[in-house]
């Protein structure tokens, strides 16, 4: 049966199940009889994946991905312990300006209007200032004026705070592409060093960072855990 061509009809649909290779299908068009036909996730990524600055309406998904990426650090930043409260607090910070978690500091990977990956970036020299609104809320919540956050970034570095890809889309190069977007932003702003932290018990992530040219510079502690501070010279 001849397929009828359609334009920009790509969208997820429950009609298509994951096949044996775990390739989710998207609607690409419809046959003359009205049945949908699809294309694989890899094909749709190649055709439709875009990178853009985050906007406030991305808050819910952004908070979810940040939480997945930073795990227990999210509890320290928010002063919350329940998942829903952690994500709500982070989403609120995301919608605001001039803080570490703000939409202003994020690039998202957008696939057909859905956020499938994020990277948070900012200059190391503004890290302390970006933490101030978070610390203010933490100190008020805990009634403790001596709460501090660990220093994560060196001055003079363009810092990758967080990178995360939706688990449905991992293994398809999106993480690497997000890191390249961060590198591009650093170069455009005149920075010669790109830096990030990776937990020492996360060799898979470290291998990814090494693949784009990052090298271990030193070891620091974040939330009492050891991290390798990695740097790429641009």
Where would I find each of the regions flagged by the language model?
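C-terminal "cap" of GNAT-fold acetyltransferases
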Residues: 139, 192-206, 210-213, 218-234
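Conserved GNAT-fold acetyl-CoA-binding loop/helix
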Residues: 71-94, 105, 139-140
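Conserved acetyl-CoA-binding loop-helix of GNAT-fold acetyltransferases
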Residues: 165, 171-188, 207-211
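A short helix-loop-beta-strand connector motif used in the catalytic cores of GNAT acetyltransferases and
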Residues: 95-108, 125-129, 159
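Conserved acyl-donor/pantetheine-binding loop and adjacent beta-alpha core of acyl/acetyltransferases
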Residues: 123-158, 162
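Conserved beta-strand in the GNAT
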Residues: 108, 114-123, 159, 164
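Conserved N-terminal entry element of GNAT/NAT acetyltransferase domains
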Residues: 46-57, 77
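Helix-loop element at the rim of GNAT/NAT acetyltransferase active sites that forms part
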Residues: 53, 63-81, 97-99
């Amino acid at each position: 049966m001849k397929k009828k061509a359609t334009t920009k009809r790509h969208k997820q649909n429950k009609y298509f199940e994951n096949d044996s290779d775990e390739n989710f299908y998207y609607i690409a068009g419809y046959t003359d009889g009205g049945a949908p036909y699809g294309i694989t996730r890899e094909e749709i990524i190649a055709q439709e994946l875009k990178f853009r600055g985050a906007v406030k309406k991305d808050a819910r998904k952004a908070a979810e991905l940040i939480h997945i990426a930073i795990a227990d650090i999210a509890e320290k930043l928010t002063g919350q312990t329940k998942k829903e409260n952690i994500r709500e607090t982070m989403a609120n910070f995301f919608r605001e300006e001039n803080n570490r978690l703000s939409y202003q500091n994020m690039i998202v990977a957008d696939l057909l209007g859905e956020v499938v990956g994020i990277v948070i970036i900012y200059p190391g020299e503004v890290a302390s200032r970006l933490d101030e609104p978070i610390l203010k809320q933490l100190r008020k919540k805990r009634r403790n004026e001596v709460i501090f956050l660990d220093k994560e970034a060196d001055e003079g570095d363009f810092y990758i705070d967080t990178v995360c890809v939706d688990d449905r889309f991992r293994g398809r190069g999106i993480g690497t592409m997000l890191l390249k977007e961060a590198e591009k932003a650093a170069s455009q702003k005149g920075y010669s060093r790109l830096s990030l932290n990776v937990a020492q018990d996360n060799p898979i992530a470290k291998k990814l960072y090494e693949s784009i040219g990052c090298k271990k510079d030193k070891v620091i502690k974040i939330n009492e855990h050891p991290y390798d501070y990695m740097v790429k010279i641009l």
